[in-house]
Amino acid sequence: MLNDPHCLRCECDRHGGYIEYSIRHLHPDWDVLTQTYEIRSMTDDGRFIYHSDFQLFPLGSSIPADFSQYPRAAKAALWQAIFRVKRYYLATFEPDIVQHLIKQPFSVPQRFAFYCQHLSLPNYDISHDRYNIWYVLKAE
């Protein structure tokens, strides 16, 4: 389990799962971040392709929201939490291939640079295409 006092629940293993992480300490309007990993397909050589998705929930809501309107400093702390959770899953379970779908394709190059800066992992090659950022576990 993620060794962090803000981790509320960690139901994941090598086959996917989810993590619930409290973000209340980051902003009074925020409640929970959920990060899921789900196997969606397999490569011809038998490696699993995981889909990664996170959602942010405002305080008292069961409907995820867009937090883009919040101040840059608050979002910087939020991204640190998101990357902490992502780093935990990738480093602990070493999924073969992870797809991070970027919902605004025009921002993929900027988001790719951001991921390279904040989620650089020695066991993974990182690349991108028009809509996704890919983490591919290096062969041993």
Task: Locate each region found by the language model.
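Non-catalytic substrate-recognition and accessory regions of acyl/acetyltransferase enzymes
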Residues: 1-140
